[in-house]
């Protein structure tokens, strides 16, 4: 029916968000996101090496902190770290249908 519904599942490590399209409880999954409480997953470089050729971007800021982004197909990985830590780590994964 074109209506989006969101389902949140909270875990010790973070939140899993499932987006569906269609009637409530009978829709098709269109998007899944996992947002971790802490950016302590794999490093940006490790995921980049694993994924291979992809759209990538990094920014380093002494004030706002550091950020990285990898997009391969319909999968997106986001990374972050504190301003003094140049080793950015995974904190979010998005999968799209």
Residues of each region from the PLM?
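Acidic/histidine-rich, surface-exposed loop or edge segments in extracytoplasmic proteins
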Residues: 25-33
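A cross-family detector of function-defining hotspots
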Residues: 1-25, 38-97
